[in-house]
């Protein structure tokens, strides 16, 4: 070995005795693990999903109001009055429908499926990204979903939080890939 690597003895020589060197290396490893542990603890510590609960509350409240103030969540006129997305109105200047439609749901099953999905996925995304980033992801994804809905559904009333929820799922997939060493 010394023939191949003539400087190996000088390079591997340690001034400390073996035990002191072992303790020093172990301490360095422990410090690095402790700092990584703090990062993981910060990322994965549970926080109350207030934004998720608020979004669910808003969707349920709007659903109830559609029955109290209109003819229910499956009535086309009521959906349009409450801000459902339809290409003829949105393209003629009712751009608010890109936003409002993500809080409307057509029928109880649509509402229940979306709110269950929002609860399961939303609380995780809110926990790892924080309240502000979570809300930004939700709203931008919902608007993007509304725009895509306009592109593919002509003369069709569109509503629901599915676009926003798929955006949250995408954010969760990104998180899983980016932080895969912590999972």
Report each predicted region and the residues it spans.
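A detector for small-residue-rich transmembrane helices and their helix-helix packing motifs
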Residues: 1-183
């Amino acid at each position: 070995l010394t023939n191949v690597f003539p400087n190996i003895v000088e390079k591997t020589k340690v001034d400390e005795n073996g035990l002191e060197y072992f303790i020093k290396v172990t301490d360095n490893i422990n410090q690095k693990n402790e700092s990584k542990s703090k990062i993981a603890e910060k990322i994965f510590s549970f926080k109350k999903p207030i934004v998720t609960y608020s979004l669910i509350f808003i969707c349920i409240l709007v659903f109830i109001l559609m029955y109290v103030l209109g003819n229910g969540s499956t009535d086309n006129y009521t959906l349009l009055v409450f801000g459902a997305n339809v290409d003829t109105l949105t393209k003629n200047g009712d751009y608010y429908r890109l936003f409002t439609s993500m809080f409307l749901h057509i029928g109880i099953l649509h509402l229940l499926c979306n709110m269950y999905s929002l609860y399961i996925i939303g609380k995780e995304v809110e926990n790892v990204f924080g309240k502000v980033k979570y809300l930004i992801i939700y709203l931008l994804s919902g608007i993007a979903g509304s725009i895509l809905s306009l592109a593919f559904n002509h003369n069709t009333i569109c509503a629901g939080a599915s676009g926003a929820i798929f955006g949250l799922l995408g954010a969760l997939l990104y998180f899983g890939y980016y932080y895969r060493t912590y999972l």
